[in-house]
Curated annotation (Swiss-Prot):
The keyword Lyase belongs to this UniProt entry's keyword annotation: no
Disulfide cysteine pairs (residue numbers): none
Signal peptide: 1-23
Main subcellular location of this protein, as a coarse class: secreted
Protein keywords: Amidation, Antibiotic, Antimicrobial, Immunity, Innate immunity, Secreted, Signal
The name this protein goes by in its record: Cecropin-1/3
Family designation: Belongs to the cecropin family.
Function (record text): Cecropins have lytic and antibacterial activity against several Gram-positive and Gram-negative bacteria.
Compartments (UniProt record): Secreted
GO biological process, one term: defense response to Gram-positive bacterium
InterPro entries registered for this protein in UniProt: Cecropin (IPR000875), Cecropin_insect (IPR020400)
Pfam families listed in its UniProt record: Cecropin (PF00272)
Length: 63
């Protein structure tokens, strides 16, 4: 059980140290994911606005 904790700790330290030196490609992937998220957010906001307008038109048409 102790070996398992030590192994996880060493693996975590290695991952952090290697991750900092190899951050270039990881940062690019993160930026792409962030951009996709922004586009999704903007499309959702736009879709909600259109749906609200359609609901207003439907309510006006009903009287």
């Amino acid at each position: 059980m102790n070996f398992y904790k030590v192994f996880i700790f060493v693996a975590l330290i290695l991952a952090i140290s290697l991750g900092q030196s190899e951050a270039g490609w990881l940062k690019k992937i993160g930026k792409k994911i962030e951009r996709i998220g922004q586009h999704t957010r903007d499309a959702t906001i736009q879709g909600l606005g259109i749906a609200q307008q359609a609901a207003n038109v439907a309510a006006t048409a009903r009287g």
